[in-house]
């Protein structure tokens, strides 16, 4: 009998997770069923409990339900606890729900794939929301020197204080960032691109920087990456690799095997019409 999985979100029709997980399952001839489920913004918890009651083995969670899924779980990982959000739930043998947040592991795995995860490098993260919260622990454990900058500065300050015991992290306002020396890696973790926007930065910050946008789009044409190309940046990447890698860690949690991501990523790029 095929094991039952799903991704829950609202909206959800755009999700590539069912396709990704079926490709993972094919690597080891596993039988799974993986659906995209539209969560009700009021009755989400009831829906999720019923899904597990009906025999589901695990779920992925996307916006806007990650914090609510975390609160629903019985036990959770440290990364999940720090983020206050879950993107993966697993039904344990005793019926309890275990929550994890694989965003950070997936992000760092993609940086490692790109050979961009270099100890002691200076990293600027734009944004101080849930996505940033989910990736800070593995970044700091990988010895990255992190600077947070956010439109609402106090949110970046509070986040830096929360994670200070795990590594080198500071908050710098967007108005002060103009005085900062160049960064080795600049990460866009804002949601501005969904409305076609981005945070413009002084050109000198890009002088030797690689740029990673956690959003993804056909041909890597997110608003932020379109902008940084005009600033002369030649090393850039969108978040599709992060999506595939975080999915791989979810699959490992459920099925006990870490799938290979490179061919899956290539297939996704081809499906999206990526042209080198």
UniProtKB/Swiss-Prot annotation:
InterPro entries: Aminoacid_DH-like_N_sf (IPR046346), NAD(P)-bd_dom_sf (IPR036291), SDH_C (IPR041121), Shikimate_DH (IPR011342), Shikimate_DH-bd_N (IPR013708), Shikimate_DH_fam (IPR022893), Shikm_DH/Glu-tRNA_Rdtase (IPR006151)
Biochemical pathway: Metabolic intermediate biosynthesis; chorismate biosynthesis; chorismate from D-erythrose 4-phosphate and phosphoenolpyruvate: step 4/7
Superkingdom: Bacteria
Cellular component GO terms, alphabetical: cytosol
List of residues binding NADP(+): 78, 127-131, 150-155, 214, 239
Enzyme Commission code: 1.1.1.25
Active site per UniProt: 66 (proton acceptor)
NCBIfam families, per the entry: aroE, PRK00258.1-2
Subunit description: Homodimer.
Stated role: Involved in the biosynthesis of the chorismate, which leads to the biosynthesis of aromatic amino acids. Catalyzes the reversible NADPH linked reduction of 3-dehydroshikimate (DHSA) to yield shikimate (SA).
PANTHER family for the chain: BIFUNCTIONAL 3-DEHYDROQUINATE DEHYDRATASE_SHIKIMATE DEHYDROGENASE, CHLOROPLASTIC, SHIKIMATE DEHYDROGENASE
Designated name of the protein: Shikimate dehydrogenase (NADP(+))
Organism this protein belongs to: Haemophilus ducreyi (strain 35000HP / ATCC 700724)
